[in-house]
């Protein structure tokens, strides 16, 4: 077998393969004889059919089977012979019989060979944040709001109050589907309704009626309403103001704090949790910034097969999240066509490029996972649980779980390696801004 290779692109190779006809004929004759032993043809006993009859009746089909099998076998022999780091399945083209050989072309994608640019050309922004007393007080107030109750008031509806009301909507003088409801509850300022709707209710009291004018957004989900002006008749039935629970013994007990330890212990625990959130948020921020800079500075081609695999992985991940959120019944009604490749392609390409570059950085720097950092990571993660020792034992003894953490820590080591040489600028941010940025990254 003769093989020549040419580069089609940075991630594709074309192999020209020539297989001697003698190899085909040898396998063809052997398979023809095996077929003769079992062939069933009228007028002949099993196993007694002349080889010439088997050749005339079955020969063309058997010959094509042999050719297909030889191409399948030899293409992988050729890839191995040429020491090609193939990705995905080869594509067979131009199969021909020339002189005493079977000749064909095969195109195969290959793992990219890249050279990473020097890190001192990278510019990375590293955020910094501190927890202050106001942040802690605001977090405790949020904990109170999560357990707030409602008290009826005769006063005017204001932002953050809950209003119970009926509404009837019209567009061009006609009622429309979903445009009316009774005993509808809405916290003013929540942003649940279209722009202007909640503002129109502010200032109303129980028992009052009012017609408000609003306009549906141009990108409204119901196309027949998008951009349309509408009138809504509002009848307020009840207005309630929020009532926060007192920080008393009962409230403290929810968080495992005794009355003796009091609010100071609550503040200390809340601060500790917030500081852990900040550390994680800052680590994720600088990791994302470093990796974004790495990808932006190194323009590389990646095989479509790797991108396709990443698209499938991201799609399956989204379906799993959908299943967890809506249950098995909801997942069964979920159609994968609702998640086309285009939805994931851009992010998948970026993810594959990053994976290739990180692998190259690991190889060039000869980085190996720091087991001490893995243990520290596990200890810190376990500290947020009721029984940290049990969690530590679980992650340290479960090989699969530990391997996942090792992968995260190894990424952190790559980031540290990049930052040691990159141009890093420090930026102070507030706790709230840091969380908003983190939520925005997760939503992408």
Curated annotation (Swiss-Prot):
The keyword Cytoplasm applies. Keywords: Cell cycle, Cell division, Chaperone, Cytoplasm, Isomerase, Rotamase. One of its GO terms (biological process) is 'de novo' cotranslational protein folding. It catalyses: [protein]-peptidylproline (omega=180) = [protein]-peptidylproline (omega=0). Involved in protein export. Acts as a chaperone by maintaining the newly synthesized protein in an open conformation. Functions as a peptidyl-prolyl cis-trans isomerase. InterPro entries: PPIase_dom_sf, PPIase_FKBP_dom, Trig_fac, Trigger_fac_C, Trigger_fac_C_sf, Trigger_fac_ribosome-bd_bac, Trigger_fac_ribosome-bd_sf, Trigger_fact/SurA_dom_sf. It is found in: Cytoplasm. Gene3D superfamilies: 3.10.50.40, Trigger factor ribosome-binding domain, Trigger factor, C-terminal domain. Residues 160-245 form the PPIase FKBP-type domain. It comes from Acinetobacter baylyi (strain ATCC 33305 / BD413 / ADP1). Consists of 3 domains; the N-terminus binds the ribosome, the middle domain has PPIase activity, while the C-terminus has intrinsic chaperone activity on its own. PROSITE patterns: FKBP_PPIASE (PS50059). One of its GO terms (molecular function) is protein folding chaperone. Its EC number is 5.2.1.8. The keyword NAD does not apply. Its main location: cytoplasm. This is Trigger factor. It comes from the Bacteria.
């Amino acid at each position: 077998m003769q093989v020549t290779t040419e580069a089609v692109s940075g991630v594709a190779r074309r192999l020209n393969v020539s297989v001697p006809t003698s190899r085909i004929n040898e396998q063809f004759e052997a398979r023809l004889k095996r077929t003769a032993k079992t062939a069933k043809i009228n007028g002949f006993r099993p196993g007694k059919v002349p080889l010439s009859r088997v050749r005339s009746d079955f020969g063309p089909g058997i010959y094509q089977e042999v050719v297909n099998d030889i191409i399948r076998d030899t293409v992988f022999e050729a890839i191995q012979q040429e020491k090609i780091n193939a990705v995905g399945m080869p594509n067979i083209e131009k199969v021909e019989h020339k002189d005493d050989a079977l000749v064909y072309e095969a195109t195969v994608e290959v793992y990219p060979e890249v050279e990473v640019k020097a890190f001192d050309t990278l510019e990375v922004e590293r955020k910094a944040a501190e927890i202050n007393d106001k942040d802690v007080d605001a977090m405790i107030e949020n904990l109170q709001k999560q357990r707030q109750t409602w008290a009826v008031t005769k006063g005017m509806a204001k932002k953050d109050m809950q209003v119970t009301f009926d509404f009837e909507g019209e567009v061009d003088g006609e009622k429309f589907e979903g445009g009316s409801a009774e005993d509808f509850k809405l916290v003013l300022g929540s942003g649940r309704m279209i722009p202007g709707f909640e503002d129109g209710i502010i200032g109303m009291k129980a028992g009052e009626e009012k017609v408000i004018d609003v306009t549906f957004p141009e990108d409204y989900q119901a196309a027949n309403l998008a951009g349309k002006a509408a009138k809504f008749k509002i009848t307020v039935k009840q207005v309630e103001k929020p009532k926060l629970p007192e920080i008393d013994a009962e409230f403290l007990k929810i968080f495992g704090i005794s009355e003796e330890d009091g609010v100071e212990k609550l503040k200390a625990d809340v601060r500790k949790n917030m500081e852990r959130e900040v550390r994680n948020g800052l680590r994720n921020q600088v990791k994302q910034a470093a990796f974004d800079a790495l990808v932006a500075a190194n323009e590389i081609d990646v095989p479509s097969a790797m991108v396709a695999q990443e698209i499938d992985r991201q799609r399956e991940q989204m379906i799993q999240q959908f299943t967890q959120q809506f249950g098995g019944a909801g997942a069964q009604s979920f159609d994968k066509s609702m998640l086309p490749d285009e939805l994931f392609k851009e992010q998948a390409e970026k993810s594959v490029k990053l994976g290739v570059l990180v692998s190259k950085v690991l190889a060039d720097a000869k980085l190996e996972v720091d087991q001490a950092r893995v243990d520290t990571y596990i200890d810190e993660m376990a500290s947020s649980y009721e029984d940290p020792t049990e969690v530590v034992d679980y992650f340290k003894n479960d090989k699969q779980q530990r391997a996942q953490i090792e992968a995260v820590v190894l990424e952190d080591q790559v980031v540290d390696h990049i930052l040691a040489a990159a141009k890093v600028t420090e930026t102070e941010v507030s706790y709230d801004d840091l969380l908003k940025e983190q939520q925005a990254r997760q939503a992408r």
